[in-house]
Structure formats: structure tokens, C-alpha cells
Amino acid sequence: MKDRLDDILMDFLESTLEPFPLSALLRFMGEAATAENYEDLSDYLSYNQLAYLNPSWNGEEPFWISRAGLFTGRTALIRPGKKELAAGVFLPGSRLVPYQDPSYLPHELTFIHNGRILPRVPYETDPDEAYPLYSFFGEEYVPQYLSLDNSANDLLFSDSDGADPSCFSLMAVDVRDVYWSGVFRAGDFLAAKVVDWAGGIFELSVVPAPEESDRDEWLGVLEESLVQEFDSIGPSASMDEQLAFSFFLGQELLFNENAVPVGDLLGWSERVDMEPYGVETRLWHKGSVIPAQS
């Protein structure tokens, strides 16, 4: 029964893009609108960060928004590396965090341009280039993500000596038509717009980088939203969850034309950095120990 209800719940959250009251979700699940069910469902959504609550100040039932609703139609910014530009490719890595459905691996995402699905091509790389592109999954998990990219990597990264291979191949997105069409200029960003969150589909285009002052203002909002997240929720279950909640807090102050790649925050901020959390990694107050959670 629980599995069936979980499936129904996820169907609703993945397909409902507009804010919704819990009463609508309970009806969809075929559950009674009792105080106990309201409380249980609210706790479940909040604990697992499946949806976010917009409090009501007028006594009416508050509304929630799903991650699909929060990020559909929104655009992640990516700064291609020199090697990617030269090869005409793009490595998704964790650069779509927190915009993407976290159940998708990077090689499972779909990218379109001018109405055409962009193919994947093998791209030779090494740890120095690839690891930073996967950093928001946590450094400790990067080898697992790389090993799952293709069958050859599964063998390379399962070598019993424990050392990661010095070079390997990843299935990159072929974006030659995007880079080399005459539209892309030095300093431009790839813009990946979420067109189907549950389907893992993004539409690629090219946008110019914002002015430095606008960039700094945007990064300041993201920084402050993360600090609020640390102080109100704690380290969460992943950096993806931390960033997703921060974008919920910032919303239109972050979903605008001044956006830059999320990873830019780490070289810019004096307040936020990646810090160890047991054997894992989280975003946290820079230089501070993350307290154990009860």
C-alpha cells in the first residue's frame, strides 16, 4: 500500500507545476482530509524536500510548490571549458544541479537545440578536467558517477588497486552546432532551460554573461539564501537539496537574467564553501565544522 501511495504522490509532484494545497494532493491520493493526514503529509514533504511550503498569512490554506514546479521553465547557466569548446562538446556533470530531477544520472539527461535532440559522443578526459564538473554530487561520489557513464568506465573504476584511471572517456553532448554556429562568443554561457523536469529534458541556447556588478548581486542573493538554509534546516541530505531549497528561498531574485553558473559561488564567497560532513561533503559556513544531526 505504501509503495502504491508513494507512486501516486510522485506522479502528482512530477506533473503538477502550479502551487497546490495539501487538500488537492490528499484528494489525488484518495486519502481523507483529516488533521492527522495533513500533518503526516506535510512532515513527509518537508523532511524529504519533495515540495516547499509558501506560508499563508490570511488564514487560508497554504500552498506548496513541487521541485518540478519550481524549476520548470527556469534556466541553468554553464561556462564551457576551453577543451569542451575546442572539441565541440559539453559535459553535464553536476552543472545542472539543482535544476534537474536528481534521480537522473548526467548521461541520462536529454538536451535539445533548435528542435533537435543533440547526440552523445565519446570524449576523452582526465580527473583534473572531469572531477570539478561533478563536484556538487560530492567528491566522495564522483568515481561512482564516472563509472556509471559507460560500460568501459565500469571496468576502469572498479580496478581493485583503488587508484582512479589517469584518463577515461565520458559520453559528452555534441554541441558543435551551438558553439560553432557563429552565435557563441568568448565569455558567453550555455543556457540550459528545463522544458520537462520529470523527463530530464533541457533546451540549450547561448546567452551573454551579465555585468560584473549584476553577477555579484546575484551571487550575494545565492550566498544569503544558502546561509538561511544552513541555519534553518541544517546540512540536508545532499548539496542538491541544499541548493534547491536556496533557490526556493531566493526565487525571482535568482531566476533572472543576472544568473551565472552556480559553481561560481565557491570562488567568490567568503561565507560559503564545501566542507566535510562525515565521509560526505556539504555546502556550509566556510571553515566551520558541520554539527552532527540528531
Task: Give the role of each language-model region.
Residues M1-S294:
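Acidic, low-complexity intrinsically disordered regions
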